[in-house]
């Protein structure tokens, strides 16, 4: 995202995903690519183009990795172009696109200074646009229905009851129609206590690490670094060999350049 100015080169992305998995396997971390991403890379290796390699990818991989695009690209049509380019290689289905559009829009809204309530509304609007992209796929209407319910439902649900809500209404599996609404439910329920919301999401079962990653992206965008304790940041940076502040600054520079060109 940083190297390309917000618009991802799909073949470069494919190569970097494959290289990353090789590095993880070499470090003893096992196979970490999701099923949709793996099938897409196999399709590319077999000669299929990026417009068709992800036509069965309906899981949450695109939504999970889309936050940097939301940071780098301001709200508007250009954001949707960037999200589609970042997603279709592996997740070119309506349900996966809707999920990725939702998370990216929520993050972009938050980075622009908006709060959590506005981020959820931005996510709903973007998901409806994303649902028109990619191959029509089962679960799309269910994802939209669950997202539309969130503002009204969460107004009646206490933070202590959000786990029950997620288990009963959204689910937490790797399919987009469960994990994306679950992530946004945790983010909205947490309010200003981003750390509590993130810990609840990470304890939800199912694909909870991905749910927490998406929730954390939205919370961080809307609340800033103060949402999470410094020791948590330090642990993530140490374990992953990354300086999150530098990455954030570089993504912010991309966003500023794009805003200057509008």
Regions found by a protein language model. Give the residues of each.
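Structured, active/binding-site neighborhoods that engage oxygen-rich ligands
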Residues: 1-262
């Amino acid at each position: 995202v940083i190297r390309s100015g917000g618009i991802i080169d799909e073949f470069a992305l494919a190569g970097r995903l494959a290289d990353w998995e090789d590095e993880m396997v070499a470090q003893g971390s096992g196979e970490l690519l999701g099923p949709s991403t793996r099938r897409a890379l196999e399709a590319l290796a077999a000669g299929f183009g990026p417009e068709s390699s992800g036509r069965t990818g309906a899981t949450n991989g695109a939504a999970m990795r889309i936050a940097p695009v939301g940071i780098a690209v301001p709200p508007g049509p250009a954001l949707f172009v960037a999200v589609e380019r970042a997603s279709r290689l592996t997740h070119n289905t309506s349900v996966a696109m809707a999920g990725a559009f939702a998370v990216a829009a929520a993050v972009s809204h938050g980075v622009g200074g908006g709060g959590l309530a506005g981020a959820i509304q931005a996510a709903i609007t973007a998901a409806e646009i994303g649902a028109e992209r990619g191959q029509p796929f089962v679960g799309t209407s269910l994802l939209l229905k669950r997202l539309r319910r969130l503002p009204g439902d969460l107004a009646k649900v206490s933070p202590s009851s959000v786990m029950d809500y997620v288990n009963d209404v959204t689910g937490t599996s790797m399919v987009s129609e469960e994990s994306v609404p679950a992530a946004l439910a945790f983010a909205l329920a947490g309010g200003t206590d981003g750390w509590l919301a993130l810990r609840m999401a990470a304890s939800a079962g199912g694909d909870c690490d991905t749910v927490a990653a998406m929730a954390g992206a939205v919370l961080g965008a809307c609340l800033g670094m103060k949402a999470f304790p410094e020791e948590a940041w330090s642990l993530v940076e140490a374990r992953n060999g990354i300086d999150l502040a530098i990455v954030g600054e570089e993504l912010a520079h991309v966003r500023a350049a794009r805003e200057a060109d509008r």
